């Protein structure tokens, strides 16, 4: 038995409420188990507790037994890249070398892990040139190369496109076929969830096992509608589109009945804006790096009140497109083309401006919110983001009052008022991204550039994102967002574009 958890719980030092309470779970060799829950439900704590990573963080209760080796990939895979290497091959085999394996054995295991994840072509690539999803797979390859008996993955698919997620599901099933086990946790239903043998729900520290219907589940799988209802009841976001939803017989057992807790209705996108003058025009945008063409003649217009979503495979260039618009490409990239704030030929060419000047028209929210945060509280972060107009000394008190009023308004609009005195890095990742969105909004840009805004969000987080975007669009702004969440892209955007081979097209 790779892992047995009996009446386990955990209380973090300095807190009164337990993060986990009375958890009992058995992880059987050769199986893949999924535990889903809302943000803050304790999914990450469960991973760390089972992986033995919380001894100094608080007080555990109950009994946890593991048989064999255990490895954990946290919800921030970037933090598990060593920082000691610059190339994929070296990074992947480093963990094996540190565990004392011979160089030839370590390299063989590393190459096999990359091949299993279908990224063996990245062996010689520089880590800095990889997309967020590719870096996530490299972090996973380091652990798979160690071949632990129990592989614990916290939100392993959050930066991956649907095709890669399906491939990863196949890889993990093959991993389990070697009498090893996998535990995955997350806030969203996706291809990995549907490939699991069992699905559990974690709600405010308590694991719902569905034992009331366990006997029935052994005979017939829970229906797809019941599974979807259970997800909504536990504030789990279901990324499946209607055509992608599996038949009821393919849905994992042990989905639980809906609770009585009300679920807020999603914010519906506003009607597509009427024809109007564009507020951003991109013409013949080209980006290359080391002689390789990444973007090839991109043409794009954004209109007031419009949300345009861009999908594409990992490494297709979605982040590169947004960074080229805001002026944040690294020095190894060359960029050409016209980026006009308005109709082509009528507004300033942003391509000729530095990033700080472009930010007057464009708000930037990157994939990793941590790199855009620097203050000690949420409120101070927003105070720093307020543009400071020129003023005389005698007007300083009035200007400060105006800044405070602006900050209070943005805190309210983005739902951050209740955490205004928290440290940004004490917030969960979706809330941190909300804070970066708020910081961009407070500068009053015409266009918001959102890179993977749905990563790691539960159902409530998705509704919160939709509400913030809807408010911005009603004020006449436009949003350009990249995403791997096809359901959100189809339900929330006015236009859906696909980036492949450097070009944009309608899917």
Task: Write out the residue ranges for each language-model feature.
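Conserved ABC ATPase "signature" region
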Residues: 105-122, 398-419
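Catalytic Walker B motif of ABC-type/P-loop ATPase nucleotide-binding domains
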Residues: 151-155, 448-452
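H-loop/switch region of ABC-family ATPase nucleotide-binding domains
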Residues: 185-187, 482-484
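ABC ATPase C-loop
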Residues: 144, 440-441
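Hydrophobic anchor residue at the start of the ABC signature
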Residues: 140, 437-438
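ABC ATPase NBD Q-loop/coupling interface
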Residues: 52-57, 63-77, 329, 338-357
């Amino acid at each position: 038995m790779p892992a047995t958890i009996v009446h386990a719980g955990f209380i973090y030092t300095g807190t009164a409420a337990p993060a986990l309470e009375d958890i009992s779970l058995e992880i059987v060799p050769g199986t893949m188990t999924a535990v889903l829950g809302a943000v803050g439900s304790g999914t990450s704590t469960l991973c760390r507790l089972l992986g033995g990573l919380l001894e100094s963080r608080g007080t555990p209760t109950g009994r946890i037994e593991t048989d064999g080796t255990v490895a954990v990939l946290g919800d921030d895979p970037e933090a598990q890249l060593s920082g000691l290497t610059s190339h994929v091959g070296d990074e992947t085999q480093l963990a094996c070398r540190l565990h004392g394996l011979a160089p030839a054995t370590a390299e063989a295991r590393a190459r096999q892990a990359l091949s299993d994840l279908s990224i063996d072509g990245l062996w010689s690539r520089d880590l800095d040139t990889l997309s967020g999803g590719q870096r996530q797979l490299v972090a996973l390859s380091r652990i798979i190369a160690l071949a632990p008996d129990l592989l614990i993955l916290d939100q392993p698919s959050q930066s991956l496109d649907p095709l890669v997620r399906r491939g990863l599901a196949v890889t993990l099933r093959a991993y389990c076929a070697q009498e090893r086990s996998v535990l995955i946790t997350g806030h969203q239903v996706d291809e990995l969830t549907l490939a699991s043998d069992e699905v559990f729900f974690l709600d405010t520290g308590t694991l719902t096992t569905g034992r009331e219907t366990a006997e029935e589940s052994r005979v017939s799988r829970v229906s797809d509608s019941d599974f979807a209802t259970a997800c909504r009841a536990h504030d789990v976001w279901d990324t499946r589109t209607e055509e992608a939803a599996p038949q009821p017989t393919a849905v994992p057992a042990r989905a639980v009945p809906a609770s009585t807790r009300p679920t807020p209705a999603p914010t519906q996108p506003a009607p597509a804006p009427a024809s109007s003058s564009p507020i951003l025009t991109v013409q013949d945008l080209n980006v290359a790096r080391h002689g390789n063409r990444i973007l090839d003649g991109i043409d794009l217009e954004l209109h007031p009140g419009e949300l345009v979503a861009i999908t594409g495979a990992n490494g297709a260039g979605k982040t590169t497109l947004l960074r080229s618009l805001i002026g944040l490409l690294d020095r190894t990239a060359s960029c050409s083309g016209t980026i006009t704030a308005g109709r082509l030929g009528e507004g300033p060419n942003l391509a000729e401006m530095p990033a700080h000047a472009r930010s007057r028209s464009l708000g930037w929210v990157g994939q990793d919110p941590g790199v855009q945060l620097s203050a000690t509280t949420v409120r101070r972060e927003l105070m720093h983001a307020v543009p400071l107009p020129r003023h005389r000394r005698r007007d300083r008190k009035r200007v400060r009052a105006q800044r405070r009023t602006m900050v209070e308004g943005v805190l309210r609009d983005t739902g951050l008022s209740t955490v205004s005195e928290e440290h940004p890095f004490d917030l969960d990742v979706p809330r941190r991204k909300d804070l970066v969105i708020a910081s961009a909004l407070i500068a009053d840009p015409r266009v918001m550039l959102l890179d993977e805004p749905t990563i790691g969000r539960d159902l409530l987080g998705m509704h919160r994102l939709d509400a913030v975007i809807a408010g911005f669009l009603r004020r006449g702004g436009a949003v350009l967002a990249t995403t791997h969440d096809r359901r959100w892209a189809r339900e929330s955007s006015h236009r859906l574009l696909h980036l492949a081979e450097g070009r944009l097209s309608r899917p």
